[in-house]
From Swiss-Prot:
This is Signal peptidase complex catalytic subunit SEC11. Residues 183-194 are annotated as: C-terminal short (CTS) helix. It comes from the Eukaryota. Residues 102-134 are annotated as: Disordered. Its EC number is 3.4.21.89. Belongs to the peptidase S26B family. The lineage of its organism: Eukaryota, Fungi, Dikarya, Ascomycota, Pezizomycotina. The active site is at 53 (charge relay system), 92 (charge relay system), 139 (charge relay system).
Amino acid sequence: MLSSLAPYMANPRQTLTQVLNFALVLSTAFMLWKGLSVVTNSTSPIVVVLSGSMEPAFQRGDLLFLWNRSPRVDVGEIVVYNVRGKDIPIVHRVMRSFPELPGREDKKSVKKGGEEGEETSSTPSQKLLTKGDNNMADDTELYAQGQEYLDRKEDIVGSVRGYVPGVGYVTILLSEHPWLRSVLLGFMGLMVVLQRE
């Protein structure tokens, strides 16, 4: 086994260069993702549709591009939101909007320095009710327990501004079959290391 590594050990400078090139590719991809997050003001500027709840507008596996710089969301707009306590993005259409009155205080339970208390905020936040185009009822059953609507500032990841059909199936396959992710990453690493200049 060690004899197969001999060509790489004979020229450690070239091997180190290849490993650093692979690390550079990974760090560049990470920086591009973070840069896109800053530009779009979204924690996930690109998401994949995971279910058929938005058919016929979007199919399972479609890749969506999000934008979260608008201060308000209009009724009929398609948004991506996260349910509190869960890390699964949901793509649905806004059915109703409930604007907060300016000056009304929102009370939020916060924990600072180990002590629990209430924090009040007088900035208005838009409240939204969503529904999948292919669903019979609105999303109140999907929201966190006791939550009747989505908060624009806290729950919305972004509004859909564009999409590419079917490209996200790769992501779905990688999440449904974790071993495939390891094989793909190992193959990419092997290709970089074995590449000769």
